[in-house]
Design a protein with these regions (language model features):
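Conserved HGGG/HGGXW glycine-rich cap/lid loop of the alpha/beta-hydrolase fold
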Residues: 15-61
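Generic recognition of short, well-ordered alpha-helical segments
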Residues: 34-38, 129, 236, 240, ...
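Flexible "cap/lid" subdomain of the alpha/beta-hydrolase fold that forms the substrate-access gate
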Residues: 29, 57-88, 97-244, 251-252, ...
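Catalytic active-site module of serine/aspartate enzymes centered on a nucleophile-bearing elbow/loop
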Residues: 247-278
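A short loop-to-beta-strand scaffold at the N-terminal edge of the catalytic core in hydrolase folds
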Residues: 6-15
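Short, hydrophobic alpha-helix immediately C-terminal to the catalytic nucleophile
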Residues: 37, 102-103, 269
Length: 278
């Protein structure tokens, strides 16, 4: 897997290559780019698909101790990657983690051509409603993150509503979940990074509320794909986001929880192809 040295540390990324328009995929907390594997398998024939592993708990190498791992800091790493790979006219896709929205109106804004906002944190929903809202409190306790990760070692516990059960309707394959959860269950440095991000939740909430003004000025094509049965992202946030974006187009994806790339990848890939044609 290719790697790149960014300001916070070494980041792994997948790159399908090719000369087509670039799509960069942002992933969720304690996940990596394999969250998009089905969608990428569909799109890679026509588009260059790039999926970095950001320091959100599934990264293999701990970041530098002084790294800014707030929501804005991690979003900045995504921007640094665009710059390092000399990408322009990028379609930026996101799901679960809402941080990529912070690139709109930033120093990296001119590299963006389109947005694909797919059931993710928005406005004041940080951390998202449900069990995740306990994480900032747990992270303040000594050993809290290590204790939180213990159930993720066991297959049966991963599907409980208090762990992963509300993220996808359909089970994520064991080997994919093993890949996601191994770093934070085995590496203290990765848990330190994850804790640092979680403790910045209040700051991230303020920044996602404030980004609404920048979204209003994003005069480029934008897809808002919202899961029809989402348990964690409020149903009204999809229409609100689409209404903010001057060229926003809303698609409600039926029979899906938050992880649309897991539950309805073919439908999402179809909507993304339509976005790329705009």
């Amino acid at each position: 897997m290719p790697q790149v040295e960014l300001s916070a540390g070494t980041i792994d990324y997948e790159d399908t290559g090719g000369g087509g328009p670039a799509i960069v995929f942002g992933h969720g907390l304690i996940m990596d780019g394999t969250q998009w594997r089905h969608v990428i398998a569909d799109l890679r024939t026509d588009f260059r698909c790039i999926a970095p592993t950001l320091p959100l708990g599934a990264h293999r190498q701990p970041m530098r101790a002084d790294a800014d791992l707030s929501m804005r800091g991690v979003a900045g790493l995504l921007g640094e990657l665009l710059e390092h790979l000399e990408l322009s006219e990028v379609t930026l896709a996101m799901n679960d983690w809402g941080g990529p929205q912070l690139l709109v109106g930033s120093a990296y804004d001119e590299r963006l051509a389109r947005l694909a906002i797919c059931s993710c944190e928005a406005f004041d929903n940080v951390p998202p409603k449900g069990p995740a809202q306990l994480l900032p409190y747990i992270a303040r306790m000594p050993g809290g993150i290590a204790a939180t990760m213990l159930p993720f070692r066991f297959d049966r516990l991963r599907r409980l509503p208090l762990t992963w059960g509300w993220l996808s309707k359909r089970p994520v394959p064991k080997e994919v979940m093993d890949r996601w959860f191994a770093p934070a269950t085995t590496q203290p440095g990765v848990r330190r990074d994850l804790r640092k991000y979680i403790l910045s939740a209040k700051q991230g909430r303020r920044e996602l509320v404030a980004i609404a003004d920048a979204l209003r000025r994003f005069e480029r094509p934008a897809l808002v794909a919202w899961a029809g049965d989402d348990r964690m992202m409020p149903k009204d946030h999809g229409p609100r986001l689409a209404g903010l974006l001057p060229q926003g187009h809303l698609e409600v994806v039926a029979d899906s929880y938050t992880l649309i790339p897991e539950d309805q990848p073919a439908t999402l890939a179809k909507h993304m192809r339509e976005l790329m044609a705009r």
